[in-house]
Design a protein with these regions (language model features):
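Hydrophobic anchor at the start of a short beta-strand
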Residues: 37-39, 121, 144
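Short amphipathic alpha-helix with an adjacent loop that forms part of the alpha/beta core around
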Residues: 51-55, 152-161, 174
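NAD(P)-binding Rossmann-fold cofactor-contacting core
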Residues: 124, 139-155
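Glycine-rich adenosine-cofactor-binding loop
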Residues: 101-107, 113-139
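Rossmann-fold NAD(P)-binding glycine/threonine-rich loop
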Residues: 171-200
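Phosphate/diphosphate ligand-binding glycine-rich loop within oxidoreductases
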Residues: 2-116, 193-200
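Short glycine-/small-residue-rich Rossmann-like dinucleotide-binding loops
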Residues: 67, 164-171, 184-185
């Protein structure tokens, strides 16, 4: 059994409303591989102060979720071209006080979308996660349209296409003729995406 001690490395996630999925997945992996690491999720209201705490406490890395995936880029030390092109990050590595963001949402979305090439793609939402999906679609030459909340009523009129929910909205109704990808981790596709994202 692993015991937390003075040498335990800390990893975490920051969200408006923290969940347990990351804690369960990451701590299970740490335990399985006998790693002296622990993962904890935090609900926060100020991403800037949260990032400051990472440096103060020497937290080794952190995940970011809604609604901070875009804003976090204002508080890191370096932004790669790929992250800059996406305009959002979901993972930050602390390299001795130097914070470098990454976007594993993009990698998972690209891996997932390969199975859906050929369909017209509708991306629901335009936040940080949506930006990763948009970049993944572009990289695969998939034509897509973004539907924001103002156009929400049009979702039920979409036929013979793929809809990709990038919002926290649950139970979205789509036509039976559509494929539906939901990023919410409590859904079947959301669990697959979370596993793919964590593997990167």
């Amino acid at each position: 059994m692993n015991w937390i001690n003075k040498d335990t490395e800390i990893y975490c996630s920051f969200a408006k409303n923290a969940g347990n999925t990351g804690c369960q997945m990451m701590n299970t992996a740490f335990y399985y591989y006998g790693l002296n690491k622990v993962y904890k999720s935090f609900s926060i209201n100020d991403i800037g102060k949260a990032v400051d705490s990472v440096k103060t406490l020497n937290i080794k890395g952190f995940a970011i979720t809604m609604p901070y995936k875009i804003d976090v880029l204002n508080y890191v030390d370096e932004v790669s071209n790929s992250v800059q092109d996406i305009g959002a990050a979901n993972t930050v590595i602390n390299n001795n006080g130097y914070l470098i963001p990454h976007n594993t949402d993009y990698l998972a979305a690209k891996q997932f979308l390969i199975d859906y090439v050929g369909d017209e793609l509708y991306i629901l939402g335009n936040g940080g996660y949506s930006k990763a999906v948009q970049s993944a679609a572009k990289s695969l030459n998939i034509d897509y349209q973004v539907i924001t909340r103002d156009g929400w009523g049009s979702i039920q009129n979409i036929r013979h296409s793929t809809s990709y929910n990038c919002t926290p909205v649950e139970n979205i109704k789509v036509s039976d003729t559509n494929k539906f990808i939901d990023c919410l981790v409590k859904t079947k596709t959301g669990k697959r995406l979370a596993t793919m994202q964590a593997s990167h």
